[in-house]
Regions:
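Amphipathic, interaction-prone secondary-structure segments
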Residues: 30-86
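Intrinsically disordered, low-complexity regions enriched in small/polar residues
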Residues: 25, 29, 36, 53-57, ...
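Intrinsically disordered, low-complexity regulatory regions enriched in serine/threonine/proline
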Residues: 68-143
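Charge-rich, low-complexity N-terminal segments
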Residues: 1-52
Length: 143
């Protein structure tokens, strides 16, 4: 679901804004889109908070023009902020995916065109810091 559609209270608004700022800390040229989907009311998208980060052009270092960031969440009515279960990032060039990393399992980056080592390391740092950001309610699986 679009990150902009997930804002239901001040705490989640703060987490969403902080997640975008955290990504931009490592990739300052990226602009954030809090509504990457035209229609995010799809039932299958209810368990994600989705962002898109667009770069000014194709970057040979990161091997893409945009990154789709999906935070897999579990909404518990008792918590004001959802639990972060996992993260999926996809490096995109229209119309195809160039690479992907998921924090469920081995945290391996796969794809046809992987980012350079420094950018790859920064993407993993973003994931680790997102778990820290949501740590008050997170069940993350990596130190």
């Amino acid at each position: 679901m679009n990150a902009s559609s997930n804002v239901s209270n001040v705490e989640i608004a703060n987490k969403i804004a902080s997640a975008a700022a955290l990504f931009r800390k490592y990739f300052p040229d990226a602009s954030v889109n809090f509504s990457p989907w035209e229609n995010s009311n799809n039932e299958s998208m209810q368990d994600t908070i989705d962002f898109a980060f667009h770069f000014p052009g194709w970057s040979p270092l990161i091997e893409c023009r945009a990154i789709l960031l999906q935070l897999r969440i579990k909404n518990d009515n008792n918590d004001r902020v959802p639990k972060l279960l996992g993260i999926i990032m996809r490096g995109m060039i229209v119309p195809s995916e160039r690479w992907r990393v998921a924090t469920i399992g081995d945290w391996e980056m796969t794809g046809t065109h992987l980012p350079q080592k420094e950018q790859k390391d920064n993407l993993f740092l973003v994931c680790k810091e997102l778990y820290k950001l949501f740590s008050t309610t997170s069940t993350g699986n990596k130190n």
